[in-house]
Curated annotation (Swiss-Prot):
Keywords: ATP-binding, Ligase, Mitochondrion, Nucleotide-binding, Protein biosynthesis. The lineage of its organism: Eukaryota, Fungi, Dikarya, Ascomycota, Saccharomycotina. It is found in: Mitochondrion. Its EC number is 6.3.5.-. Allows the formation of correctly charged Gln-tRNA(Gln) through the transamidation of misacylated Glu-tRNA(Gln) in the mitochondria. The reaction takes place in the presence of glutamine and ATP through an activated gamma-phospho-Glu-tRNA(Gln). This protein may be expected to contain an N-terminal transit peptide but none has been predicted. The keyword Coiled coil does not apply. The keyword Cytoplasm does not apply. This is Glutamyl-tRNA(Gln) amidotransferase subunit B, mitochondrial. It comes from the Eukaryota. Subunit of the heterotrimeric GatFAB amidotransferase (AdT) complex, composed of A, B and F subunits. One of its GO terms (molecular function) is glutaminyl-tRNA synthase (glutamine-hydrolyzing) activity. Its main location: mitochondrion.
Amino acid sequence: MSQISMFVRKLHKFSYNPNYKFKCGLEIHTQLKTKYKLFSLSPTSYNEPPNTKLSYFDVGLPGTQPLLNPEALLLALKASVALNCDIQSYSSFDRKHYFYADQPLGYQITQHYYPLAKNGYVQLNKFDDMPDKVISLEQVQLEQDTGKTVNYDDRINVDLNRANTPLIEVVTKPDFENIDQVQAFVRKYQLLVSHLDICTGDLETGAIRVDANISVNNNPRVEIKNLGSSGEIVDALKYEYNRQVTLLQNNGKIIQETRGWNGIATESLRKKENAVDYRYVPDSELPVIRLDKNIQAQLQNTLDELPDSVLDRLTKEPYNLQLAHARNLLFQPEILDYYENIFGRIRDANKWFFHELLAAFAKSDVEFQVDIVLPDMLVDIVSSVEKNEISLTGARIILKHIIRNKSTKTLPQLIKELDIGKPEASAELEEAINEICQQIINTNADVVEKIARGHTNALQVLIGQAMKATKGKVHAKEFRSKFMELLK
């Protein structure tokens, strides 16, 4: 059996060896949601035809100079504050020299000597399904992305649309003691930057790319580059931990290197470079960034409510949501806004929102959209049920009709059109209810027999048929009462 096959088998039954301590740090590259690129006026582009969104500076044309995008700086500062970092009053840009086809300048503009922010932290906690754990951050730096190389027809093609896209690189300390903590941190980070509209938060599209530095028993660290999904992160770390443990058990030596993940195994890419190899020098074409000493407090006051705070609020009085429901709302800000709009305006808002409204969208196979069933419409529907103007079944019929037909009619118009208004109480109505119930009893002898044997849940079958026969005009409790009377 090859070494790779052996390691792959171990992935499926992974466990930590208590004699070999797992230690990991992350470098997270995050594309900022700006209109323009970091140092040019080219629009940021992710889905356009190759090499169509470029400026002379993006392609490294001699004589062109960089111009800092203030929107990118603001988003980087927002992220730094949200990550509990210390904003630096003085920061600057440096050139990181290396040659590769997707980097036309021959260097990357980054912040090596004086980064934008330092000394942050992220708190893992119950909202991440984790014990309390603080992950410390080294720094946050603003830098430019590279282009992309694409292998096609035995050629390497270069697409520079992504070149000079603004990034922040978040560097953690090696505080991760297991892979579950890594997963929880990445999920939390994704949620944070997407919630604050700093980044889309997508791993799969490359908006967030993760490099992991892993070591065992404080041996030299190995960097795994460009992990593009949660699954890749987990599998690559499991594989690399097993590889290093096996090497040490066989008296091998861990070398500091950069490795890639090919979907099955990590593979060596190059010996790990150090700062000298990159020949960092200050970028003389970009001025230093000097920030007011009050910038940290000012930014803190402008930030939206952070995810942990939202989850804490939603799981307490008066909302009392389950954590799973609160998370779902947090991941979908439009739905959260809708929920908070109707909460307090109707009784039992959680039942109506989750079990009636969202269920109606799901059953209709339609993605939730605020403008299909407006908050005021839902409030009116609930009010009509509470006033006994329509039944619960009638409300469900109306919701499904609006969703499936994108109806913009008023509630009274829908009640009339669908003929689901509750009939006026009268002797004739009582007689009609009695006749319907008796007819259903006569045609469902097997169900009646189950009820007689004590299977009271079977009564719902009869009630459901009665509700269907009356198109939901009569409340289920009235049918329940009549069936129980007739079946005594």
